[in-house]
């Protein structure tokens, strides 16, 4: 996975992080993200800049940019619903290219307003009141260096 520190794709501005056994935490304000709007935060397993790709290309599980690569959706949300999920790909070829990915995602977690256990929505009556900023933490589990699952919690 690479994180961008710029508004456009520039391979010199990406850096690789390993999330296995780690976590990602962030604060989010979804108060103005209503129905029909998706606020997204996701990570993709882009090839390293030193790979044989020329020019360096963006990729994701939907083949945006012309290439497939693994994707993890940390957040597809608005003030009424929240979704996380992982998109696996087949094994990469010798050149590091993937020929297909799961575009719908696996291990999906959907949190909807009035779902009970999660108590999420735009009102003070909800435990997670999306009219105000809240914190999200996603922990990535691994065994022997392989992704085995994740949990996402709100505070």
Region spans (language model):
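GH16 jelly-roll
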Residues: 1-155
């Amino acid at each position: 996975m690479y994180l961008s520190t710029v508004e456009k794709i520039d391979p010199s501005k990406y850096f690789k992080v390993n999330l296995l056994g780690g976590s990602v935490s962030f604060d989010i304000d979804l108060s103005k993200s209503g129905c029909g709007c998706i606020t997204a935060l996701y990570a993709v397993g882009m090839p390293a800049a030193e790979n044989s790709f020329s020019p360096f290309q963006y990729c994701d599980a939907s083949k945006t940019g012309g290439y497939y690569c693994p994707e993890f959706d940390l957040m597809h949300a608005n003030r009424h619903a929240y979704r996380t999920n992982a998109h696996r790909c087949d094994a990469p070829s010798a050149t590091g290219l993937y020929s297909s990915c799961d575009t719908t995602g696996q291990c999906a977690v959907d949190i909807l307003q009035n779902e009970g256990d999660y108590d999420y929505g735009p009102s003070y009556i909800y435990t997670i009141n999306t009219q105000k900023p809240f914190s999200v933490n996603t922990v990535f589990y691994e065994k022997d260096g392989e992704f085995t699952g994740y949990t996402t919690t709100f505070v």
